[in-house]
């Protein structure tokens, strides 16, 4: 689940930065 959580966090950060 850690990988999924990390991916979700990265996607979230990407959306925020965008």
Curated annotation (Swiss-Prot):
Keywords: Amidation, Antibiotic, Antimicrobial, Disulfide bond, Secreted. The modification Alanine amide is found at residue 18. The keyword Iron-sulfur does not apply. It is found in: Secreted. Heterodimer with subunit B; disulfide-linked. GO terms for cellular component: extracellular region. This is Halocidin subunit A.
